[in-house]
UniProtKB/Swiss-Prot annotation:
Forms a heterodimer with PSMG2. The PSMG1-PSMG2 heterodimer interacts directly with the PSMA5 and PSMA7 proteasome alpha subunits. Degraded by the proteasome upon completion of 20S proteasome maturation. The modification N6-acetyllysine is found at K265. One of its GO terms (molecular function) is proteasome binding. The modification N-acetylalanine is found at A2. The modification Phosphoserine is found at S181. Chaperone protein which promotes assembly of the 20S proteasome as part of a heterodimer with PSMG2. The PSMG1-PSMG2 heterodimer binds to the PSMA5 and PSMA7 proteasome subunits, promotes assembly of the proteasome alpha subunits into the heteroheptameric alpha ring and prevents alpha ring dimerization. One of its GO terms (cellular component) is cytoplasm. It is found in: Cytoplasm; Endoplasmic reticulum. GO terms for biological process: cerebellar granule cell precursor proliferation; chaperone-mediated protein complex assembly; proteasome core complex assembly. The modification Phosphothreonine is found at T18, T55. This is Proteasome assembly chaperone 1.
Length: 289
């Protein structure tokens, strides 16, 4: 039986959970003290830490519990972060309030203070003119076992239901499930998925079943659904997953959304900044320079 709305839990009879628990118990009986120590060291290495990048000191409290938050915008992936850099962060003064430092099989966040489009990072900013507005640019991969840690340290266990969350991310068009051939689709294109408490108008069609979302974006939306926080995910399906100007500009319909339109001032200037970002990326990606 399929779920009828986002967040519905559909239970099916299955012995897999019991068998997995039995296997874990058997494994723990076979483990030597050295095995357990290796596991502890690996778990410690995979911890997600929130800190101030300039001083490398840990944040003492949950990020959004320290500051009142009315609006939280999260960009996941290089194209989504480039969109925020060009069209949103250009229109105001943003102050860095922290970053997530993490390690996993696919990425290691950078320690550099001056970030470039090719760096791997997860940085949080606060709007100086309205300190209740927060923004996160996350170009790194956050593994499944690290996502709850990230949510715990950013949102906490008692998040404010008065805030609104907007998430931007991309997936390859081959992940889009449709009766038609994906070759006939004009990419890039946007789809949206929202929590039940999100009531604003959407900037694109809703994501059709049986499509699903993945990774940190899915974790954030699930968290907001559970805590009844108004949230929307805008998913851009594209055939180019590297930094790409056409894919970045596919997010432009969001500039008229309630959460972003008050943050954007000069679109022509933002377009020029996007061109410079693309040029910088091309230079850094060229093995001959």
């Amino acid at each position: 039986m399929a779920a009828t709305f986002f967040g519905e839990v559909v239970k099916a009879p299955c012995r897999a959970g019991t068998e997995e628990e039995e296997e874990e118990e058997e494994q723990s009986r076979r483990d030597t003290p050295e095995d357990r120590e290796v596991r502890r060291q690996l778990a410690r290495k995979r911890e997600v830490r929130l800190l101030r990048r300039q001083t490398e000191t840990s944040l003492e409290a949950v990020l959004l519990e320290t500051h009142p938050c009315s609006k939280f915008i999260i960009a996941v992936g290089s194209n989504a972060t480039a969109f925020l850099s060009a069209f949103v962060m250009n229109s105001g003064v943003w102050e860095e309030v922290g970053c997530a430092k993490l390690w996993n099989e696919w990425c290691r966040t950078t320690d550099t203070v001056r970030l470039s489009p090719t760096d791997v990072f997860c940085v949080f900013y606060q709007l100086k003119s309205d300190p209740s507005v927060f923004l996160c640019q996350c170009s790194c991969y956050i593994a499944e076992d690290q996502q709850f840690q990230w949510l715990e340290k950013v949102f906490g266990f008692q998040p404010r239901k008065s805030m609104q969350v907007t998430v931007l991310t991309c997936r390859h068009i081959t992940d889009y499930k449709t009766p038609e051939s994906t070759c006939s689709l004009s990419s890039p294109f946007l789809r949206a998925l929202k929590t039940q408490t999100f009531k604003d108008a959407l900037c694109c069609p809703l994501l059709e079943q049986p499509n699903i979302v993945h990774d940190l974006s899915a974790a954030v939306l699930s968290y907001c659904q559970v805590w009844k926080i108004p949230a929307v995910l805008y998913l851009c399906y594209t055939d180019v997953m590297k930094l790409d100007r056409v894919t970045v500009e596919a997010f432009k319909p969001l500039l008229s959304s309630r959460s972003l339109k008050c943050l954007v001032k000069n679109i022509p200037e933002s377009t020029e900044i996007l061109k410079k970002l693309m040029t910088t990326n091309e230079i850094q990606s060229n093995i001959y320079t």
